[in-house]
Amino acid sequence: MTSRPQIHVHDAKEANKQTATKLTLPAVFTAPIRTDIVHKVFTDLNKNRKQASGVKISTRGTAGMGHSAESWGTGRAVARIPRVGGSGTHRSGQAAFGNQCRKGRMFAPLKTYRRVHRRVNVNQKRHAVAAALAASALVPLVFARGHRISNVQELPYVFDDSVESYEKTKQAVAFLKRVGAYDDVLRVAETKALRAGQGKLRNRRYKLRRGPLVVYGNEKSTLTRALRNIPGVDVCNVNRLNLLQLAPGGHVGRFIIWTESAFKKLNEIFGTYSTTGVQKSGYQLQRPLLANADIARIINSNEVQSVVKVAGTTETHERKKNPLTNNNALFKLNPAAKIVKEQAKKAAEASKAKRQATLKANRKAAKTHKKGSQAWIAAFNKANEEAIAKARQEDADFIAQGQEIKEGDE
C-alpha cells in the first residue's frame, strides 16, 4: 500500500508544475491488493460481453443434417453409419450425419441457450475494483504491467479540472506530452498488429495494448471526445469505474490519470475503514490482514521473541552400520582389515598385469606363427605351380614327339 498521506494536484497547462492544492489520499488506495479476487471477477465479467452463438438451425434441419440418408444395416461388411441414397453420383452411398463424416454435423452441436454469462456478487466486484485502484498507486506494479512512466512525477497522478474542458484531440495530445504520459501512448502505437483468425472480418481487424486510463468527474465533460481517437487511451467516469478497464486481462497496475473532481469523489464512493460508501450503499472496504507487512520486523520484535520457545538440544543417536557391508565400520572395528584389503587389491592388480603380459606375448607369438605359415603356404603353392607347369610341358613335348613319329611312318 502507499504510505504518502497527501497527493499533489498538478497543473495541466504547464509541465512539472504543482498547484497549491493538496488532497488527502483516499482510503481505497490503501485497500489490500487481492489479485485472486481481481482475476476471478475479471474472468466472469469478461464473459458477459459474449453474444449467444451456436450451430445454424433452419427449416431444413440443423447444419450437417440436411440429407436423406438411412443406415444399410448389417450384412454388407460396411459401417452402420447412415448413407445417402440414390445412384449415378459420387454422393450416393457416402456416409452422412456423423461428426466423422464429410459434410456431417459436429459432435454435440452448440446451442444458443448455453450458459455463457456469469453472475458476480456485487460486493465481490467492489472488492476487485478497490484492489485494482490500490495497485494503480504502486509504481512497481505499474512498471511491471509494461507502462512507460519514467517521466511521470508521482502516482496517483492528479490534475486540475481544466483537463475536463478539452474538446480537441490536439489539446489532449499536447497535455499527454506535457505530463510525460505520451511515452506510454507511443508504446501502444508500436504494438498495433493484424488480428489472427476470423475476428479481422468482424470489425476487430487490429489489436493493440492498453495505455493510460483517464478518469474524470464531471458528467458533462467533453474530455471523452478529445481522447477517443488516441490509441490505447481509455476514458471512464469516476462513478462508473469498471474492472475491465482498471485491470485489463485481470492484471493489476494500470496507469491512471485523475482529475481533481474525480479524485475527491473516491471517499464518497468507496467510503473509508470507519464509514461506508454513500454511492455504494453499505459497502465497507476490506481491512488488511497485516497492518505491517514487514515480517522480519514482526518476528524480531520484543513481543514475539519474549514468548518464542527457546531452542532445545536434540538427542542424536549414532546410526548402526553393518561392518560386513560397510568398509568404514569394518576398519573401525578391525584396523588390520584395511591392510588385508589393500594387499589383496595389490595382488589382484599384479595378477591382472601378469595375465595381460602373458596374453600380449601369446598374441605376438600367434601373429608371428601366422606370418610364417602364410610364407610357407605361399612357397608351397609356388613350387606346386612350377611342378604342374613342368609336368604339362613334358606332356606337351611327349605328344608333339608322338605326332612327328606318326607323320614319318606315313
Curated annotation (Swiss-Prot):
PANTHER family registered for this protein in UniProt: 60S RIBOSOMAL PROTEIN L4 (PTHR19431)
An example Gene Ontology CC term for this record: cytoplasm
Compartment list: Cytoplasm
Lineage per the UniProt record: Eukaryota, Sar, Alveolata, Ciliophora, Intramacronucleata
Gene that encodes it: RPL4
Main location: cytoplasm
Keywords, ordered alphabetically: Cytoplasm, Ribonucleoprotein, Ribosomal protein
Family: Belongs to the universal ribosomal protein uL4 family.
UniProt-recorded name of the protein: Large ribosomal subunit protein uL4
GO biological process, one term: translation
